[in-house]
């Protein structure tokens, strides 16, 4: 596995750089198909927590929950009861229960699931709510969903092996009313697939990639829930190659896509998609990229302080040398110190845990990089 620089507590992350997070405590074992969610701080807590739920290795499916306290930089095995073992499920946090984590779908060694369960982090208990309306058929899921407000949107997913479910209906679960529905959509939906990413930005849902059998897709689709019309987008720029089992997040006007698998191996690339300009950019990094991986999980976390660039680091070094010589010009003072507002700002990081390569090596590392 490639060695990345370590981002220590209190460090300012540099732009265009991948880091490893080293955390103490009861960390999860290596796994794939887990979910990764960030919960903001509650009560007197200064920083939020990352929740790693479920997953699998070649021998078993997991029903455990591990957390990272971003204030203490410690792992904790959040002993909980009631979660059915599952991997390649999805996790989401609806607006109506902002401090609870819901999971849907996935599988264990006995087959696919289509049930919903809810974690109360305070009591560390899972419940299985009674829902109404026709649910999607059991399916592996993972990144094939996205939530907007109280609603989870489901499209596609895996049925058996490399074959997706043949259903191209958009399924909607309302966490407030505990109801499944299948709204009428317009336009041509994406073809059946699994291992695609589905991410929400505003009122739009974006779907990229995935596979069916040995066919890897590189297309990008969008549906706006305000008019329920499917569109196949034709973006410009350096688009990702056909891939599956990758990850995606939305930050402001951008989508970020990382990793995945192709017919030739696992990817370690990250792409940025500008939603308004419909333009792809392959991001370049100053250091070596992380090990290529698939079936990992990714979320956005806040990191205290602003990030720096190589140019800013160089300027800071020059200022420090000038200060040692007694040069306290206005320029030097301004460049040498952060304002109080800057020091209190947070940098957003893409946080990635686990996954595997196409040779079967499974990972248990935490890697991060700053995003705009």
UniProtKB/Swiss-Prot annotation:
The keyword Membrane applies. Its main location: cytoplasm. Residues 321-330 have a biased composition (Basic and acidic residues). Rab9 effector required for endosome to trans-Golgi network (TGN) transport. It is found in: Cytoplasm; Endosome membrane. Phosphorylated on Ser residues by PIKFYVE. Kelch repeats lie at residues 49-95, 100-146, 151-203, 204-250, 254-303, 349-372. It comes from the Eukaryota. This is Rab9 effector protein with kelch motifs. Residues 309-341 are annotated as: Disordered. Gene3D superfamilies: Kelch-type beta propeller (2.120.10.80). InterPro entries: Kelch-typ_b-propeller, Rab9_kelch_effector. GO terms for cellular component: endosome membrane. Keywords: Cytoplasm, Endosome, Kelch repeat, Membrane, Phosphoprotein, Repeat.
């Amino acid at each position: 596995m490639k060695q990345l620089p370590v981002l220590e507590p209190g460090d300012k992350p540099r732009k265009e750089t991948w880091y490893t997070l080293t955390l103490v405590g009861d960390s999860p074992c290596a796994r794939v198909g887990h979910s990764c969610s960030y919960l903001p701080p509650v009560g007197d807590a200064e920083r939020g927590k990352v929740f790693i739920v479920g997953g699998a290795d070649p021998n078993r499916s997991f029903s455990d929950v591990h957390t990272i306290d971003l204030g203490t930089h410690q792992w904790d095995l959040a002993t909980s009861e009631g979660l059915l073992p599952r991997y390649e499920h999805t996790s989401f946090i609806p607006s109506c229960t902002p401090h609870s984590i819901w999971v849907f779908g996935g599988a264990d060694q006995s087959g696919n699931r289509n049930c919903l369960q809810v974690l109360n982090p305070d009591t560390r208990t899972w419940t299985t709510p009674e829902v109404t309306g026709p649910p999607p058929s059991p399916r592996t899921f993972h990144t094939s969903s996205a939530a907007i407000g109280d609603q989870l949107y489901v499209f596609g997913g895996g049925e058996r092996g490399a074959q997706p479910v043949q259903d191209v209906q958009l399924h909607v679960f309302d966490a407030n009313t505990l109801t499944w529905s299948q709204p009428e959509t317009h336009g041509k939906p994406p073809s059946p697939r699994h291992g695609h990413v589905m991410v929400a930005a505003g009122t739009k849902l974006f779907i990229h990639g995935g596979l069916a059998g040995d066919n890897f897709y590189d297309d990008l689709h969008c549906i706006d829930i305000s008019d329920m019309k499917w569109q196949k987008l034709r973006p410009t720029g350096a688009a990702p190659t056909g891939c599956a089992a990758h990850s995606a997040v939305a930050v402001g006007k951008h989508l970020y896509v990382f990793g995945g698998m192709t017919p030739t191996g696992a990817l370690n690339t990250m792409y940025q998609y500008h939603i308004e300009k419909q333009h792809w950019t392959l991001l370049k990094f100053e250091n070596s990229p992380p090990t290529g991986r698939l079936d990992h999980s990714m979320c956005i976390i806040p990191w205290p302080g602003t990030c720096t660039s190589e140019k800013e680091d160089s300027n800071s070094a020059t200022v420090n040398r000038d200060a040692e010589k007694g040069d306290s010009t206005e320029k030097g003072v301004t460049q040498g110190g952060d304002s109080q507002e800057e020091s209190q700002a947070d940098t957003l990081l893409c946080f990635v845990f686990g996954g595997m390569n196409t040779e079967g090596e499974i990972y248990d590392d935490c890697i991060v990089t700053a995003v705009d």
